[in-house]
């Protein structure tokens, strides 16, 4: 059976705020009705009901600044901010980023690939044995420690292909915040004919020897000599309005690759065109924290701090949930959120030669760790596989790694993760550096953590072993000053 493999370059970032009349209001339960009535607001939906109530509200006034000033001056209000619209673009054009890794090796690995058993499912060998896993010494770590992951990783993204053969055994029920309904299937964004065509192995939308780019905006980034571009005549399967379809499934596949016995909770806060609202992301964080998530993986960022987002982050941290966020693809030393919030593990992208990816944001204010983010092969809807570039695909490596730590040290708190994973390959301006799972996890187990793998014999222990030891790996002398 032939399966298509695609190249994907993406990270969630915020669009500039436009004039709007929707806001996120936070007030105590005893004051919220008074605030709404006093300022002529209309409640659209409740985002969270706890010590404070968080509401999505609207105002009939088009004067955004005036409404903000008026409501924020009310002493009964905890916070008040405009709703933000977010999107899932390709690598940010502001950096004119170029990829340092040739796609030739990726293409070569797709030809004549074999199928292998991986913890109860059959997957392509180039998924379990690839450059990214070799760099972080995943296979060596798994062999030495028998750690395969525990707990639940909630992924806030575009959903997931709940029927993907590699993922069905580890997915737990999620929620679709874009439709306000249980379940988080990415295929719900497709019309039935398109969904059926995607899952056909003989659809013939491309030659099996080619690798695709889903969005023409990436043409300037990817090498023309090694990349097949999606022909416009084939867009009846996945048209341009669905440019970010598959992103959530790709993130889920990376978590599963690192931590194959951890469970995954897909939370759909983004549409297939990459659009979302800040209110849905806030709801998703609260939902994850209240519904058993051990880790929340967030491959998105916004450029301005948000009181509502920060409150949701703090709530999750208070419930001992580990939060991981992509650092952004602007190629800048800048702050983005939630990666720059205290307690959040901000993840940058590194290359196959252990340098900072050209597109990755950097600096101690936004990056706690780096992980490979170029040419990472992972799952894609329809039982397919794809290769991705971007900090979107670095973040889930750390999310998976966090569950390995939790398996060895079940009582670990969010801050402990930083310490236990800090035996790294140092990279300038990339926090503690590029994660080294063998160095960190063997140190963890040997220092007294108990390892009790739930699935030591349930499948291949692949995730490639490095053929050379990383002599420069080791704890950094002083970590980053993360805000």
Q: What are these language model-derived features?
A:
Residues 19-100, 149, 295:
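Inhibitory N-terminal propeptides of secreted protease zymogens
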């Amino acid at each position: 059976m032939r399966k298509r493999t695609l190249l994907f370059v993406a990270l969630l970032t915020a669009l500039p705020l436009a004039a709007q009349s929707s806001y996120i209001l936070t007030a105590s339960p005893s004051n919220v009705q008074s605030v709404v009535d006093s300022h002529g607001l209309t409640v659209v939906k409740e985002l969270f009901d706890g010590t404070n109530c968080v509401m999505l509200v609207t105002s009939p006034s088009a004067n955004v600044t005036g409404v903000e000033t008026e409501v924020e001056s009310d002493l009964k209000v905890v916070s008040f901010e405009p709703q933000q619209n977010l999107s899932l673009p390709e690598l940010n054009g502001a950096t004119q980023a170029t990829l340092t890794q040739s796609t030739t090796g990726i293409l070569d690995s797709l030809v004549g690939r074999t199928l292998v058993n991986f913890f109860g499912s059959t997957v392509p060998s180039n998924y379990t044995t690839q450059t990214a896993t070799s760099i972080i010494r995943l296979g060596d770590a798994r062999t030495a420690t028998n750690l395969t992951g525990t707990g639940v990783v909630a992924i806030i993204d575009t959903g997931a292909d709940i029927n993907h053969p590699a993922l069905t055994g580890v997915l737990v029920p999620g929620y679709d915040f874009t439709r306000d309904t249980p379940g988080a299937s990415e295929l719900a964004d497709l019309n039935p004919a398109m969904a059926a065509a995607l899952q056909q192995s003989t659809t013939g939308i491309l030659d099996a020897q080619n690798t695709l780019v889903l969005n023409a905006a990436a043409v300037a980034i990817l090498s023309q000599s090694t990349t097949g571009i999606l022909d416009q005549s084939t867009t009846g399967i996945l048209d341009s309005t669905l440019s970010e379809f598959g992103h959530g499934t790709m993130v889920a596949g990376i978590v599963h690759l690192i931590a194959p016995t951890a469970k995954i909770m897909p939370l759909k806060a983004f549409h297939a065109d990459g659009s979302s609202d800040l209110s849905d992301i806030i709801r998703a964080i609260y939902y994850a924290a209240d519904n058993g998530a051990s880790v929340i993986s967030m491959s998105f960022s916004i450029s301005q701090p948000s009181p509502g987002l920060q409150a949701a982050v703090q709530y999750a941290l208070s419930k001992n949930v580990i939060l991981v966020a992509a650092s952004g693809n602007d190629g800048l030393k800048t702050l983005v959120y939630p990666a720059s919030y205290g307690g959040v593990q901000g993840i940058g992208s590194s290359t196959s030669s252990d340098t900072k990816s050209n597109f990755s944001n950097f600096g101690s204010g936004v990056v706690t760790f780096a992980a490979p983010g170029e040419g990472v092969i992972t799952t894609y809807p329809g039982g397919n596989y794809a290769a991705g570039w971007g900090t979107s695909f670095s973040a889930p490596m750390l999310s998976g790694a966090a569950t390995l730590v939790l398996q060895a040290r079940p009582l670990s708190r969010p801050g402990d993760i930083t310490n236990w994973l800090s035996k790294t390959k140092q990279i300038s301006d990339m926090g503690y550096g590029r994660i080294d799972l063998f160095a960190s996890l063997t140190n963890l187990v040997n220092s007294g953590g108990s390892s009790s793998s739930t699935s030591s014999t349930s499948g291949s222990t692949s995730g490639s072993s490095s053929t050379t030891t990383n002599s420069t790996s080791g704890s950094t002398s002083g970590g980053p000053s993360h805000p």
